[in-house]
């Protein structure tokens, strides 16, 4: 693979943006550090705030989904180097999420507010959700997910390692560990306001729809192997421990391919 300086710089900028908006989103939902958070003092009328927030959420969802479609990727690949296709996706997603965080309008009353040990539990779950979501990006190859591998920062993956369905590690517990972590992070809070509730509901709904599309693609790719995996492992919520031997042991040597939904 040719390592072109322009490709390396642009992909590094996209990854840096990914890192910044991830930390920014954590602070946004936690209500710390950043000037505008998911809940806060009203800045405009409730109707206007709800309309703006819904528009921002829809804009992000459309961008995140449409740019992941094969037709759009094919169109884009005819106009930019193939090594930068993923980088452009990450970069545009960074910008759209940053716009949401900057333009978000807090509104409404507080839904719940807990303190003491319950608040500690809520914050612990919030942190655990983000740790799970971020850890899951490395389970599917973080460098490829953010476009660094394609741009030349690391060796290209061996195509032979992407032919099997990976069901080890976090994927032996739930089929979509990244989404499990995000949903947990969206809902685990000691202070839930109306605008936070809107964000959590919309984001969770988008994840649910995205999972359906992703699983359709995975079934088309892996066929009966994925059907068997889906029958044994839940999508988002881990099952209670079951008797040893009732689930096939995964082959830990099999590595996953970054899935469409992570796009």
Functional labels for PLM-detected ranges:
Residues 7-24, 49-54, 83-96:
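Alpha-helical transmembrane segments of integral membrane proteins, especially early/N-terminal helices
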Residues 88-94, 118-133, 170-180:
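Membrane-interface loop-to-helix entry segments
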Residues 1-6:
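Short, Lys/Arg-rich, polar N-terminal cytosolic tail immediately upstream
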Residues 31-43, 72-77, 105-117:
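Membrane-interface helix termini and inter-helical loops of multi-pass transporters
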Residues 40-48, 75-92, 155-160:
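Juxtamembrane helix-capping/reentrant segments at transmembrane boundaries
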Residues 19-20, 24-27, 47, 56, ...:
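Hydrophobic transmembrane alpha-helices
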Residues 66-74, 104-112, 137-153, 214:
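Juxtamembrane/interfacial segments flanking transmembrane helices
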Residues 44-58, 118-135:
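Alpha-helical transmembrane segments
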């Amino acid at each position: 693979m040719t390592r072109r300086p322009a490709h390396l710089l642009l992909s590094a900028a996209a990854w840096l943006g990914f890192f910044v908006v991830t930390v920014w989103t954590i602070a946004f939902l936690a209500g710390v550090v950043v000037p505008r958070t998911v809940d806060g003092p009203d800045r405009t009328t409730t109707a206007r705030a709800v309309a703006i927030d819904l528009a921002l959420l829809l804009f992000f969802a459309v961008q995140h989904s449409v740019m992941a479609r094969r037709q759009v990727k094919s169109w884009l690949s005819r106009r930019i180097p193939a090594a930068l296709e993923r980088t452009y996706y990450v970069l545009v997603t960074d910008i759209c999420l940053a716009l949401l965080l900057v333009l978000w309008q807090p509104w409404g009353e507080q839904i719940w507010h807990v303190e003491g040990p319950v608040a500690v539990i809520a914050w612990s779950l919030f942190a655990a959700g983000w740790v799970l979501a971020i850890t899951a990006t490395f389970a599917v190859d973080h460098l490829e997910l953010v476009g660094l591998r394609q741009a030349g920062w690391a060796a290209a993956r061996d195509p032979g390692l992407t032919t099997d369905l990976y069901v080890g590690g976090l994927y032996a517990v739930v089929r979509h560990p990244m989404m499990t972590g995000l949903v947990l992070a969206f809902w685990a809070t000691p202070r839930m306001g109306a605008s936070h509730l809107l964000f959590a509901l919309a984001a969770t709904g988008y994840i649910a729809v995205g999972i359906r599309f992703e699983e359709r693609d995975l079934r088309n790719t892996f066929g009966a192997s994925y059907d068997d995996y889906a029958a044994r492992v839940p999508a988002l919520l881990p099952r209670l421990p079951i008797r040893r031997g009732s689930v096939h042991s995964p082959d830990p040597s099999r590595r996953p391919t970054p899935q469409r939904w992570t796009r």
